[in-house]
Amino acid sequence: MAVVPGGPSSRPAVGAQFFCTAGRGLEPFLMREVRERLAATQVEYISGKVFFTTCSDLNMLKQLKSAERLFLLIKKQLPFPVSSVSKGKILNELQRLINDDPESWLNAISIWKNLLELDAKKEKLSHKNANPLKRKVGEDDITAKKLKTEQIQELQETKECQLEKQIEEKILEQGNFITEGEKFQKLQDDVTEAVDTRNQTNLTFRVSCRCSGAVAKTLTAQEVGRVIGIALMKQFGWKADLRNPNLEIFIHLSDVYSVLGIPVFRVPLACRAYIKTAGLRSTIAWAMASLAEIKAGAVVLDPMCGLGTILLEAAKEWPHVYYVGADVSDSQLSGAYDNLRAAGLRDKIELLQVSVIELPLPSESVDIIISDIPFGKKFKLGKDIKRMLQEMERVLRVGGTIVLLLSEDHHRHLKGGEASSGPLNSQGGHTEEPGGEERLTPAEKAAVSEPVSSPFAASNQGRLDRMPPLGSLVPVDCYRVSLGKTDALISKYKKSHSPGR
């Protein structure tokens, strides 16, 4: 699947094709977001990735909140049949990804160039008109530090490969592909020069690979990267540069698909510049807030706010709201205060040091409650979870919404101690890997086409129907999401009536 050639601007008339990576279970949130925020079309998903077409520029693309990383799509095709062919045959097929369709690569580079050029022009205009005294101090440092952390994590999780030294003997020793002091403007200038059609040989690149499933048993990421890298150098005359390339090529080979793309941003979208100290994953926090139906003028409470990540994400997206964060811990509230100050939201969010089971708020005074209920080895809540929910129920108005992040044990406790539907682990929930909509059942296809992107929630609806309400709190939605080493449930409830009625 080739991207559409770009014109003189960064907004091709028929749109460009992108894909985002997402934490497992967040795909429905991302599908809904790209439709609503980017007016995206041709939206489809596979486990961990959402594909779409949009005419949006970089400024709009940067605003995606439920995505981890954003890529410009070069190709998406069926997987290589590794079980029926030799390793040499597979390596030849890898070379054909470049040699059989070089035009799709040049089209992708053209669109990528146009996106960066227009963004650079807007950035220069913004700096020219801005008062330098009003610039936020420390934001670049925060981004750089977060980028370094994200790079280390990504290298560990995806076993990202570097092109080996055999590709080009004169390549500098492998290191981080971006240094903390590197300026994005220099990259844009280099790219503008390098991707000029008369100067293609000046373009430098590196290849990042990920292999999973049966492919990983046959090929290593290093082998794939070497073959792709050599093919690109021979086809286009590009030069490999592991430390500071103009361009990065990402390739993921699995049992379900083969995907190639170009990272649009060097800093992952999930790495928020406005969050000084990370607590809950920002994408999870935003997804929870997006379920809460926040409207202007509402009172929103996080009674166990920790470092305030949920409130930060909500306040950035829905600013005209009164936010209250509560926590019993001095250190957590101190971290939350630092985060609010760094994000410029100190006047938007009020912090209270109180216990979740003794909230100093009148009954039915809160419109929305969003909270990450602590769990794990450090937190043993047991039956206290029901006491907490009763206090939340008390302060919530009738018709109000509660969105909670729950462990399997907490979720089972709230269901009245019913047996779990199965162990909650990294393979639980809706983790099938359909190769786009062509692998979905008719019912799932209909669900995916809905504006709210509900195929994941639909798979849990049977369990929701059997769940007894906790007092006046009636379950509405339930999404199983990955937190890395473990999974959790984003559960949404509505208050149907006042207790005692």
UniProtKB/Swiss-Prot annotation:
Reactions mediated catalytically: guanosine in U6 snRNA + S-adenosyl-L-methionine = N(2)-methylguanosine in U6 snRNA + S-adenosyl-L-homocysteine + H(+)
Location(s), subcellular: Nucleus
UniProt EC number: 2.1.1.-
Any one annotated GO CC term: nucleus
Family annotation (SUPFAM superfamilies): S-adenosyl-L-methionine-dependent methyltransferases (SSF53335), THUMP domain-like (SSF143437)
GO molecular function: RNA binding; snRNA methyltransferase activity; tRNA (guanine) methyltransferase activity; U6 snRNA (guanine-N(2))-methyltransferase activity
Keywords on record: Methyltransferase, Nucleus, RNA-binding, Transferase
SMART domains: THUMP
A single GO BP: regulation of alternative mRNA splicing, via spliceosome
EC class of the enzyme, as a word: transferase
Primary location: nucleus
Positions of region (Disordered): 414-469
PROSITE patterns: THUMP (PS51165)
Ion transport among keywords: no
Domain THUMP intervals: 149-264
Compositional bias segments (type: Basic and acidic residues): 430-442
Function: Catalytic subunit of the THUMPD2-TRM112 methyltransferase complex, that specifically mediates the S-adenosyl-L-methionine-dependent N(2)-methylation of guanosine nucleotides, most probably at position 72 (m2G72), in the U6snRNA of the major spliceosome. This modification in the U6 snRNA affects the constitutive splicing efficiency of introns that have suboptimal splice sites and can impact final mRNA levels.
Subunit structure: Part of the heterodimeric THUMPD2-TRM112 methyltransferase complex; this complex forms an active tRNA methyltransferase, where TRMT112 acts as an activator of the catalytic subunit THUMPD2.
Protein family (similarity comment): Belongs to the methyltransferase superfamily.
Protein name as annotated: U6 snRNA (guanine-N(2))-methyltransferase THUMPD2
Source organism of this protein record: Bos taurus
Gene: THUMPD2
